[in-house]
């Protein structure tokens, strides 16, 4: 099942791209004048024919072939913990700087009388 994104294959994205382009072309051709305005019908019918061909003649079977047991290996194990340690140190350093520069900032009293 190569090429699966969000549980759907490349054909769904191909159809979505086709219809987005057809919609864009139809909007652009609506502004045209003369005989070019009527070419919207041919663009729409062409997209409809391409869609029916892609839907009626699928390349893969509907049910995927059973696969063997997959072993999941975490190849980025050490890098993930190094990144976690680095981000934790930056977070703690930021909290320390926030504490020293913002929270513990001294507030000086104003003199009551000026002599």
From Swiss-Prot:
Q: The organism sits in which domain of life?
A: Eukaryota
State the UniProt keywords alphabetically.
Answer: Cell projection, Membrane, Transmembrane, Transmembrane helix
Q: Where in the cell is it found?
A: Membrane; Cell projection, Cilium
Q: Which GO terms describe its cellular component?
A: cilium; membrane
Q: What does this protein do?
A: May be involved in ciliary biogenesis or function.
Q: What protein family does this chain belong to?
A: Belongs to the TMEM218 family.
Name the encoding gene, please: Tmem218
Membrane topology classification: Multi-pass membrane protein
* TM segment ranges: 5-25, 38-58, 81-101
Name this polypeptide is given:
Transmembrane protein 218
Predominantly, its location class is membrane
- Quaternary assembly: Interacts with TMEM67.
């Amino acid at each position: 099942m190569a090429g699966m994104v969000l549980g759907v294959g490349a054909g769904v994205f191909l159809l979505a791209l086709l219809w987005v382009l057809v919609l864009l072309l139809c909007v652009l051709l609506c502004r045209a004048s003369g005989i070019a305005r009527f070419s919207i019908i041919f663009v729409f019918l062409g997209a409809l024919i391409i869609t029916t061909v892609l839907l009626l003649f699928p390349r893969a079977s509907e049910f995927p072939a059973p696969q063997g047991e997959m072993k999941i290996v975490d190849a980025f194990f050490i890098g993930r913990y190094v990144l976690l340690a680095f981000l934790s140190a930056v977070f703690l350093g930021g909290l320390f700087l926030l504490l020293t520069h913002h929270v513990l900032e001294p507030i000086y009293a104003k003199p009551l009388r000026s002599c």
